[in-house]
């Protein structure tokens, strides 16, 4: 873990990893926000399911995805913004919010993976590598550098 504590420019390496993971999470929340604004185009891109399908399973899956997208706007998106601001200001709330946001970043791809492994293995693997792996390393990096944060 000492390599995550090595200073690299303005921040220790573990903090850089956390900032990168949080930036990647902002991409995920941005895609979810876009889905809510233009669901039909998100369907055409293949990132959401058709809401008005004749297939009841497809419709149910789309409604579940819409609910997840809405929930992402209410909790993980603001939490990620708070984490970024707090980490850049070296505040303890940044550490706490960063750990929480990255925990969500590990959880949601695992949920996605178990839900869709049989039909979308390539996408599942990409999602795990793009989101879960950096977020897991970010949790370790934040924890390794917890003394770097100021209490006030």
Which residue ranges define each predicted feature?
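Topology signature of small-to-medium multi-pass alpha-helical membrane proteins
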Residues: 2-152
């Amino acid at each position: 873990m000492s390599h995550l504590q090595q200073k690299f420019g303005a921040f220790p390496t573990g903090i850089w990893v956390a900032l990168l993971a949080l930036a990647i999470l902002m991409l995920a929340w941005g895609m979810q926000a876009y889905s809510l604004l233009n669901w039909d185009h998100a369907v055409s891109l293949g990132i959401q399911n058709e809401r008005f399908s004749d297939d009841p399973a497809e419709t149910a899956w789309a409604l579940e995805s819409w609910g997840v997208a809405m929930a992402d706007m209410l909790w993980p998106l603001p939490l990620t913004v708070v984490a970024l601001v707090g980490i850049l200001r070296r505040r303890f709330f940044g550490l706490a919010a960063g750990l929480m946001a990255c925990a969500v970043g590990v959880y949601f791809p695992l949920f996605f993976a178990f839900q869709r492994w049989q039909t979308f293995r390539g996408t599942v693997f990409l999602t795990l590598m793009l989101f879960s792996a950096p977020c897991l390393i970010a949790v370790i990096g934040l924890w390794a550098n917890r003394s770097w944060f100021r209490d006030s």
